[in-house]
Amino acid sequence: MSTPDNRSVNFFSLFRRGQHYAKTWPMEKRLAPVFVENRVIRMTRYAIRFMPPIAVFTLCWQIALGGQLGPAVATALFALSLPMQGMWWLGKRSVTPLPPSILNWFYEVRGKLQEAGQALSPVEGKPDYQALADTLKRAFKQLDKTFLDDL
């Protein structure tokens, strides 16, 4: 669930972790006021889908209209970097340890899952946002939607 040393993460593995975190995080509207992940994941998916064609279009358009090549390439590279920035942020967030207020909430959700008879693996080290995403995804699948009301 979580790595013992969250700070020793390879730069390129952050992108993989970001993809995994985006797939794991439950996209529930009730979590949106508390966590920024819903907006970041939605915008990153949007950027993955639309930024490459926009980059190609702006590059071709500026070249066709006799624009300079330098600014055209810079604009295209910026547009192409937006999805990567989103994935990098998500990967960095996934290995960030939970703050104390969310940590208490994390243990309460785990307790509700255990009360419901779900077998959970023990948490290794300090829980991070990836562990929270795994727990929330499982809670939304296994528990009724009212489990958030009690917390």
From Swiss-Prot:
Membrane topology, record value: Multi-pass membrane protein
NCBIfam families noted in UniProt: PRK01816.1
Keywords: Cell inner membrane, Cell membrane, Membrane, Transmembrane, Transmembrane helix
Transmembrane stretches, start-end: 46-65, 69-91
Protein's UniProt name: UPF0208 membrane protein CKO_00500
Family the entry assigns: Belongs to the UPF0208 family.
Source organism superkingdom: Bacteria
A Gene Ontology term for the protein's cellular component: plasma membrane
Subcellular location, record wording: Cell inner membrane
InterPro entries in UniProt: UPF0208
